[in-house]
């Protein structure tokens, strides 16, 4: 049996929105391209599977669970359970939440496994699958059936079957045929499961849940044997356990009180027991120690999964938040230990089918042996008839006959053993009809063979010998070898199948790697292509930049020369009176400087594309207007016209502006500066604004993409809910249509019956009138008789009696007729009621169809919305890619633009003081904003540092408490070791003294007399015994000191747990210290920068304004900081409220969908019950038709009376069986005590009972009776009688079954409510039967006295449900009723009904 380790997977959930808002750090990370997890700084763990925060449900299922589903179909038991702290994603991973409102991509392990299982079942048509489902909850260490809530917790018990597998007795197992039924049962169980709300989780599981799928496979063996017999089918039984554990909780974090606190205690105790089991199984040093499975019920249920015969996968769910560091570390440690657990999975073949196959093969061999023996007998008879003179041949044949007779006797013994085994198997194991039929045929065949053998032996006088050729022996040997070869071949086939599976897995992995390589190659080609295009564009842009720089230098030279000419004219310069032409001010002003022969310059600076958003244009225009306002304030007016047209219109405007620049000169005020220089300034500003606009575009597109993705998820969820509701509606519509058909059928039957009744009503009315007339006539005659004076008084009394009898009969007849008339009216109204119900059902079906049409319409609309959203998302993704590519190119040009800005600034410094002043103002504003942000960031870091310090203090206090407890245990260990050292010292000194005394005694023995020698030898023996005991003690003490086992195992375990907890807390403290140090460093640097910045602020403010303005500005600065901080906190609070609102909305939506689901389920159940009711009504109407409508109410009454009588009889039989068992136990105990001698009680090795054995025998006798044997059907009793007639040797085990089956006792005793017999002869026969049965019982009890020496007695226990507690008053009444004489008891109703039949036969 091959051992395999438990597979362990770790799944790290992403940070929650609440954790991200509070800036929780990520302390658990996945090492890329490996199956390793790192927690904190340097703690690395390796597992079988590792899933990061971006892993999907499909990935988890395909990697971990799919192989388990394949193993389940192969016949192995499988288990998957999720382990981790509360709120780490266990229920989400397993899939135990509300399934109807979950989209396809977010479904957990259980729904996917259910689909996979039924898909595999559909792929194997040659195998009959029987699927059962159970759902158990462990709540407060009590078992609870989630599929049958009415089942009491006391009726559910954990037991072990004959193979050692853990089973739950009393749990409901539902047969299912499809995945939809399983999903509905799972949904029903999830709705009944205990969940609650804590501070860490809105939907916290308050119990452990185990969802089990049991599959029984029956392989159809279509190959027949050579002689035409069929082998029994092959049975395989396997189970899949899906375990959703409740998370470990800390009261300080969850804030549980009251009932939630009690639940937390039970949850933590169960998880502690599970952790102890994992530690015991995973620690190689503790393999020989006891495994504490019985410490909790969840560990008992997981016994097969941890160290048993199942294939197990443990999924450890971990929170990455730094606030849960210690919990995550402990979970990873337990998961690492679980990797050392090894299971021994086996295929679960049904033992009954294997036994039947073996017996059928043995029967086949015996049949062949009998045929060969019969052939040998015929040959020997032929030889005897021929009278061959060869005496040597006769002697050899006689020897062969003797040998064959010995073999025949052996075969007969085998047949008898097989026969008794089959009879026992038939009584103990429930067989189906096919197997029972086979057994009965085999019984008949054995009986026929025995008869044929007897007749053949009688025919030849019982002296004929058997002969068999040597070929038969060789055939049997060859068949045995063939059987061995078949077993070896089957084992080889299993190995080959395993190898084939491994080869398939390797092929799949190779294919996956090839596909990944292809994908990487394609992505590499695309990246190379993009890189080549980018290089080409960069080269083109570099060339353009060089050309533009050359032309810009030329243009600057021409501008400076023209400016000198204009400024040097003085008063001769003419100032035009009209307004100058305006220059368009757009995003790229570099084009509006005329370049005569460069049309390719548009490739560098192009206008934004047509698909840019309007809001981006609006923002751009507002910023441009703000720039214009600043320029007008400085008396440098530059009016610009904005073009909102398309790209063509913009290009036309650019060409026109270029011609204006060529044809006209710029007209300025006398003290103004040249406007072309200002154009270069605006050009730089617009280039910067372009980059900002591109970033804004990307942010807007990403936000819109997130919104569209959210809408897409909502539409998918609505689609799944609508599809689920449509499926349920179709099921309900179909069921209601079937119910309508049943109602129509019932209505037709009721109409036909009502027609019959209408005829009978008229007849009954006629009979009623006639009866009334007869009644009136009899009353008149009675009055006449009373008025007449008859001489004979006796005659008068006789006539009065006769008339009164007639009157009573007539009244009774009238009452019966009136009742029949009422019943006929009710039956006639039945068809009308059915028509009404059918109309109501048709209306509900129409309403459901209308709902279905609406849902279909909604589905179409949602599909269209989904397609539109997909298109929008693809378009936004394409835009983002293009903008990112464009911004990447522009970022490559930033150094050139910065160089140009530097040149422009150097050129403008001398003459443009006002522009410098504006730039200084902007810089000061930016600087103030940066200072405010620095202060805010510093305060936020301070708050985070304070929170980390508080957490570290809590961890340190916890560590100190653990250290105190550890120091207490270590001191105890030290004191114990010191005590052991002193003990060992005392023992050694005492041993030295004893050795001295022994040496002295030995010297005295040599010199003393005989009497003294005996005394001294006795003293020496005493001293030697004391020495041996002291040596043993010293050896034990030395062993304890050597191994360090000073404390008890519990204290050692507690010390081990404390060391682990301290280690985890030290790691958490180390992690906290590291984060605190980093924060302190950043805070010191920020403090230094802030102090320097504050000094700069004060200096600049002192230079700009007086002291009062400076103080006001400083106060304003603090006020702004406080307001920004309050704004941040309010924003954080608003985000939390939004998240809570979203959670509440999701909860409301889930509850509404669950309510709709439950309504449809209730409607479905109600429809099913109505359908069953209508079928029963049809059966009654059919029965009524067969009886022609007479006595229907009488049959109802008789049935009800019979049911009541049977219930009374059942109660009586239970009571009498208990009394008989008690009496039987007492009588058997007395008989055993009388027959067994006292000397026999002390013998232990001869198979005779000890006193303890007597007690055990009485206990076995207590449970020996089997009431089920009294409830056998007639066919089974015939089989038992035929089987018992075939037996040649008495079976001692059957004696126990014969004891409770004492028909005279039960036939003589009857319940008090039984019918009294009218004949006295019957009572006499009953008395005689009772005396016979009493004598028979005493003889049987004497036989039972010797049963104590029999072996192999199998006690059969009654079910606990058959026992109930009775009151003292009821007990006294029963004892008083038992004290009554047996002859006065009434006969049982069943026996009364049987006696006339027995008399007839």
Curated annotation (Swiss-Prot):
InterPro entries: Kinesin-like_fam (IPR027640), Kinesin_motor_CS (IPR019821), Kinesin_motor_dom (IPR001752), Kinesin_motor_dom_sf (IPR036961), P-loop_NTPase (IPR027417). SUPFAM superfamilies: P-loop containing nucleoside triphosphate hydrolases. One of its GO terms (molecular function) is ATP hydrolysis activity. One of its GO terms (biological process) is epithelial cilium movement involved in extracellular fluid movement. Keywords: ATP-binding, Cell projection, Cilium, Cilium biogenesis/degradation, Coiled coil, Cytoplasm, Cytoskeleton, Microtubule, Motor protein, Nucleotide-binding, Phosphoprotein. GO terms for cellular component: cilium; cytoplasm; extracellular region; kinesin complex; microtubule. Residues 352-413, 489-557, 705-886, 916-1070, 1118-1154, 1190-1219 form a coiled coil. Residues 5-341 form the Kinesin motor domain. It is found in: Cytoplasm, Cytoskeleton; Cell projection, Cilium. The modification Phosphoserine is found at residues 643, 646, 672, 675, 704, 999, 1367, 1389. Residues 643-662, 1259-1332 are annotated as: Disordered. It comes from the Eukaryota. ATP binds at residues 84-91. Testis, pancreatic islet, germ cell tumors and Jurkat T-cells. Its main location: cytoplasm. Residues 1259-1280 have a biased composition (Basic and acidic residues). Residues 1281-1292 have a biased composition (Polar residues). Interacts with STK36. Belongs to the TRAFAC class myosin-kinesin ATPase superfamily. Kinesin family. KIF27 subfamily. Plays an essential role in motile ciliogenesis. This is Kinesin-like protein KIF27. It comes from Homo sapiens.
């Amino acid at each position: 049996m091959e051992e395999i380790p438990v597979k362990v997977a770790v799944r790290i959930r992403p940070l929650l929105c609440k954790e991200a808002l509070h800036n929780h750090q990520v302390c658990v990370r996945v090492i890329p391209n490996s199956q390793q997890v790192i927690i904190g700084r340097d703690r690395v763990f390796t597992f079988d599977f590792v899933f990061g925060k971006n892993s999907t449900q499909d990935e988890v299922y395909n990697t971990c669970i799919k192989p388990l589903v394949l193993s389940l179909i192969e016949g192995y038991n499988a288990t998957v359970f999720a382990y981790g702290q509360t709120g780490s994603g266990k229920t989400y991973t397993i899939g135990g939440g509300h399934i109807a409102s979950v989209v396809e991509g977010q479904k957990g392990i259980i729904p996917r496994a259910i689909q996979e299982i039924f898909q595999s079942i559909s792929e194997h048509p040659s195998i009959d699958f029987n699927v059962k489902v159970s759902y158990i909850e462990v709540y407060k260490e009590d078992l609870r059936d989630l599929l049958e809530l009415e089942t009491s917790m006391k009726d559910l018990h954990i037991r072990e079957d004959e193979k050692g597998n853990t089973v739950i007795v009393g749990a409901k197992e539902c047969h299912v045929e499809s995945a939809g039924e399983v999903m509905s049962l799972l949904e029903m169980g999830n709705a009944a499961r205990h969940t609650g709300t804590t501070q860490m989780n809105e939907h916290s599981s308050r119990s452990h849940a185990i969802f089990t799928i049991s599959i029984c496979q029956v392989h159809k063996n279509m190959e027949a044997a050579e002689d035409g017999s069929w082998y029994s089918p092959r049975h395989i039984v396997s189970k899949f356990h899906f375990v959703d554990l409740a998370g470990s909780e800390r009261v300080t974090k969850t804030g549980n009180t009251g009932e939630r606190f009690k639940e937390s205690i039970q949850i933590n105790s169960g998880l502690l027991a599970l952790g102890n089991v994992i530690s015991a199984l995973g620690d190689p040093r503790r393999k020989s120690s006891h495994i504490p499975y019985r410490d909790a019920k969840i560990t008992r249920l997981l016994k097969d999964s941890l160290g048993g015969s199942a294939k197990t996968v443990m999924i450890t769910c971990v929170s990455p938040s730094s606030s849960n560091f210690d919990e995550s570390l402990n979970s990873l440690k337990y998961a690492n230990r679980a990797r050392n657990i090894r299971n021994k999975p086996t295929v679960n073949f049904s033992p009954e089918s294997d036994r039947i196959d073996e017996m059928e093969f043995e029967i086949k061999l015996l049949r062949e042996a009998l045929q060969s023996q019969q052939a040998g007998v015929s040959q020997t008879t032929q030889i005897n008839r021929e009278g061959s003179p060869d005496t040597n041949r006769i002697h050899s044949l006689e020897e062969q006959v003797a040998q064959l007779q010995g073999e025949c006797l052996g075969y007969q013994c085998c047949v008898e053993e097989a026969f008794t085994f089959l009879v026992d198997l038939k009584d103990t194991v429930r067989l189906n009809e096919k197997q029972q039929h086979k057994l009965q045929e085999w019984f008949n065949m054995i009986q026929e063979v025995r008869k044929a053998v007897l007749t053949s032996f009688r025919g030849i006088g019982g002296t004929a010998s058997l002969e068999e050729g040597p070929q038969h022996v060789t055939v049997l040997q060859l068949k045995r070898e063939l059987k061995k070869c078949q077993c070896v071949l089957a084992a080889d086939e299993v190995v080959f199948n395993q190898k084939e599976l491994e080869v398939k897995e390797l092929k799949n992995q190779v294919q996956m790697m090839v596909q990944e390589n292809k994908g990487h190659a394609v992505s590499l080609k695309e990246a190379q292509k993009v890189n080549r295009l980018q290089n080409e564009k960069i080269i083109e842009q570099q060339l353009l930049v060089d050309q533009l720089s050359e032309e810009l230098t030329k243009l600057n030279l021409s501008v400076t020369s023209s400016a000198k000419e204009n400024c040097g004219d003085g008063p001769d310069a003419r100032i035009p009176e009209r307004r100058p032409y305006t220059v368009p001010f757009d995003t790229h002003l570099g084009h509006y400087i005329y370049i005569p022969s460069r049309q390719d310059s548009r490739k560098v600076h192009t206008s934004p594309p047509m698909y840019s958003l309007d809001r981006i244009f609006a923002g751009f225009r507002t910023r441009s207007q703000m720039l214009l306002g600043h320029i007008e304030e400085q008396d440098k007016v530059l009016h610009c016209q904005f073009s909102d047209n398309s790209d063509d219109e913009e290009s036309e405007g650019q060409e026109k502006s270029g011609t204006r620049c060529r044809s006209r000169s710029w007209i300025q005020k006398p003290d103004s500066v040249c406007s072309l220089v200002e154009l270069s300034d605006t050009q730089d500003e617009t280039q910067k604004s372009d980059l900002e606009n591109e970033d804004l575009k990307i942010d807007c597109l990403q936000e819109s993409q997130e919104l569209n993705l959210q809408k897409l998820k909502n539409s998918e969820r609505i689609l799944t809910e609508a599809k689920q509701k449509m499926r349920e509606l179709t099921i309900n519509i179909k069921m209601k249509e079937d119910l309508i058909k049943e109602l129509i059928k019932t209505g037709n039957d009721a109409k036909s019956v009502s027609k019959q009744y209408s005829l009978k009503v008229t007849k009954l009315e006629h009979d009623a009138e006639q009866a009334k007339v007869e009644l009136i006539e009899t009353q008149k005659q009675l009055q006449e008789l009373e008025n007449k004076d008859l001489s004979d008084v006796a005659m008068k009394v006789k006539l009065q009696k006769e008339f009164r009898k007639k009157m009573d009969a007539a009244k009774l007849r009238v009452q019966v007729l009136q009742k029949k008339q009422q019943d006929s009216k009710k039956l006639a109204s039945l068809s009308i009621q059915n028509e009404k119900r059918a109309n109501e059902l048709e209306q509900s079906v129409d309403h459901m169809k209308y709902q279905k049409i609406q849902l279909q319409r909604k589905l179409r609309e949602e599909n269209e919305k989904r397609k539109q959203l997909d298109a929008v998302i693809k378009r936004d993704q394409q835009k983002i890619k293009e903008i990112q590519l464009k911004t990447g190119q522009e970022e490559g040009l930033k150094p050139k633009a910065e160089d140009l800005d530097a040149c422009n600034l150097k050129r403008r410094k001398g003459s443009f003081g006002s522009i410098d002043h504006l730039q200084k103002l902007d810089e000061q504003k930016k600087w103030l904003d940066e200072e405010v942000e620095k202060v805010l960031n510093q305060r936020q870091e301070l708050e985070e540092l304070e929170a980390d310090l508080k957490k570290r203090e809590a961890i340190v206090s916890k560590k100190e408490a653990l250290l105190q407890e550890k120091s207490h245990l270590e001191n105890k260990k030290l004191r114990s070791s010191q005590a052991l050292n002193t003990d060992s010292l005392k023992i050694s000194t005492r041993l030295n003294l004893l050795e001295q005394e022994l040496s002295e005694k030995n010297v005295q023995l040599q010199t003393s007399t005989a009497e003294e020698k005996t005394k001294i030898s006795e003293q020496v023996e005493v001293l030697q015994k004391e020495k041996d005991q002291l040596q043993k003690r010293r050896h034990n003490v030395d062993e304890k000191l050597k191994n360090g086992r000073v404390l008890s195992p519990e204290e050692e375990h507690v010390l081990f747990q404390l060391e682990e907890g301290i280690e985890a807390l030290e790691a958490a403290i180390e992690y906290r210290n590291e984060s605190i140090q980093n924060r302190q460093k950043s805070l010191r640097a920020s403090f230094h920068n802030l102090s320097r910045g504050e000094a700069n602020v004060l200096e600049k403010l002192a230079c700009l304004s007086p002291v009062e303005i400076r103080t006001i500005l400083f106060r304003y600065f603090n006020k702004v900081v406080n307001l920004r901080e309050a704004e941040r906190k309010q924003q954080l609070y608003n985000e939390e409220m939004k998240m809570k609102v979203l959670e509440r909305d999701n909860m409301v939506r889930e509850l509404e969908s669950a309510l709709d689901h439950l309504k449809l389920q209730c409607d479905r159940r109600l429809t099913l019950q109505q359908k069953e009711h209508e079928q029963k009504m049809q059966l009654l109407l059919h029965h009524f038709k067969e009886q022609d409508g007479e006595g229907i109410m009488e049959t109802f009454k008789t049935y009800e009376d019979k049911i009541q009588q049977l219930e009374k009889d059942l109660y009586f039989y239970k009571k009498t069986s208990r009394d008989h068992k008690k009496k039987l136990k007492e009588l058997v105990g007395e008989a055993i005590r009388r027959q067994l001698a006292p000397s026999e009680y002390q013998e232990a090795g001869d198979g005779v009972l000890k006193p303890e054995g007597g007690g055990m025998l009485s206990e076995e006798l207590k449970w020996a009776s089997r009431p089920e044997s009294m409830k056998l059907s007639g066919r089974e009793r015939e089989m038992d009688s035929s089987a018992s007639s075939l037996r040649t040797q008495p079976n001692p085990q059957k004696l126990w079954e014969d004891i409770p089956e004492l028909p005279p006792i039960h036939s003589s005793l009857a319940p008090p409510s039984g019918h009294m017999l009218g004949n006295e002869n019957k009572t006499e026969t009953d008395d005689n039967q009772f005396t016979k049965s009493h004598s028979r019982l005493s003889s049987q009890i004497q036989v039972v006295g010797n049963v104590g020496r029999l072996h192999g007695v199998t006690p059969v226990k009654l079910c606990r449900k058959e026992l109930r507690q009775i009151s003292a008053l009821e007990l006294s009444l029963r004892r008083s009723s038992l004290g009554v004489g047996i002859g006065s008891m009434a006969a049982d109703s069943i026996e009364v009904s049987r006696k006339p039949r027995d008399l007839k036969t």
